[in-house]
Amino acid sequence: MAGLALLGPIENLLLASTITQLHHRLESVKFLPDAQAPGHDPLNYGVVTAEAVALPEIAAPHRNRTYCLTVTSKPDLPGEPSLWSAAVDALAAGSDIGRSRNGIELLGPPDPSAARLIVVSAGNVDDYTDDYRQTCDLSPIEDPGQAWNVLTVGASTQLTDPPSDPSFVGWQVLGEDGDISPHSRTGMIAGGERWPIKPDICMEGGNVLADQHGDFEPSHPLLSLRTTHIRDDSALGSANATSAAAAQAARLAAMAMARYPSYWPETVRGLMTHSAEWTPKMRSEIRVESGLKKRRRLLTRFGWGIPDERQLLSSSGNAVTMVVQDEFVPFTGDTYRMRNFRLHQLPWPREALLDLGAADVELRVTLSYFIEPSAGRRGWRNRYAYASHGLRFDLQRPNETTSEFTRRVNREAAVNEDGGASGSSAANWTVGPEQRDKGSLHQDIWSGDGPELAATGGVLAVHAVGGWWKNNNRKDRIGLPIRYALLVSLRTRAEDVDLYTPIATSLAVPIEAAPVEV
């Protein structure tokens, strides 16, 4: 996995005649005890993780890092917070932690300058069956992959060429091209719809061979990823499943950090899902489902797809991404009474959109931030009792003034906090607000034509909803700013349209909105 995290799959590099320039390095920490030593107490997994995270930071405190965690365990309650996932959430948010009888102990408020991007594997299935999809869907993501603040990585596969080895005559490749890997767990049965959609993305995890007698070969080199050998630096080996997928995702995240050194961990996490694409196989299933809840269920199998390295590291003429990093105080007043907003004027070229006519256009929006988990396990089964706060985004409707927009957003936020359904329109969105507003990474895709998009006001709101900070009236959290990354991209399949140039000449300036009383 070290080779995958550093180089990615190595075949193309071996065939290339050019020198590969690396812009990131590896660090490693021994996480598991020796085979002869007693294992860690599961109640201490969070503390052990915190100690492992601290070691490289002490040695070299000023490096930007991506943490890759591929050690997982069976969840007690799939999808719901655990001591381990809460500890990982706290570490990602920049909180120091200890352990108490009732859960984790937060040793102070989160420090945004200490925030961390943690990549976690979704975990691997226990057994293989011919109906690999059902097996994957009935195998819930392992702990701590359900953590809100991490980037959870499942495995897909495009390795479908059967081996020519005579010993495998009659064997068939199990997974279809572009489908979920037979190795991967999913979030299909993850505790209902209160919790985040997981996994967030997929990466190549290899395939499995099956014969007619119910036997399976899960690790054939041709259906795995070629990489450096686990023990011999001069030899090649192979890796597969969700650990290999997570290592590749960590590599992409590290490359993004090197390419954009000013980006926060929250931003890079958002960029990973924002640049992800579904394979034709995945897309055919997502698009055929008309119900938003059904689409959400498919997301719990594939996430947002496979990150595109080119899109991750650059924009093109007909696909351009705007990245905003901002912070604000979500609530003010002694009782968190005043809700605050950020409004962003989107710099899309109205004329270019109108010129598109009936041509398809996509507006992709990603909102990424980190929550502070509640220290005590009591109330964790309520998502508003687990997270310190939440953020939401909403797009101004056609013919809606800015003041009407802010009043509507505030009204719907209050209803949402009370457990009511969001009044935001789901029209044209892939999953809609009811499905996307879970966790701390919110993404959705608006699809339509250029004139439809041009008719909106071009203003996007980011607003807060309450969590345990507000519910518990925590005086020591009043006035704390929270930060977020907002990524917005316009894409069109029209080849003769240049969206990049007119957008690049314009800047998105946040409009300060007055606080609105809750």
Predicted region positions:
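Short, small-residue alpha-helix embedded
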Residues: A2, A245-R259
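Long mid-to-C-terminal assembly/interaction modules of large eukaryotic proteins
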Residues: D360-V518
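Catalytic-core environment of secreted peptidases
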Residues: M1, S156-L174, G178-A246
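Secreted peptidase-domain scaffold signal
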Residues: K293-R392
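Subtilisin-like serine protease catalytic core
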Residues: M1-N44, H62-Y67, G79, P112-A115, ...
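Hard-cation-handling environments
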Residues: Q248, P265-E266, H274-W278, M282, ...
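Active-site core segment of subtilase-fold serine proteases
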Residues: M1-L4, G8, L14-A35, P61-T66, ...
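Substrate-binding/access-modulating region of protease and related hydrolase catalytic domains
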Residues: F31-A147, T157-T160, S234-N240, A244-A246
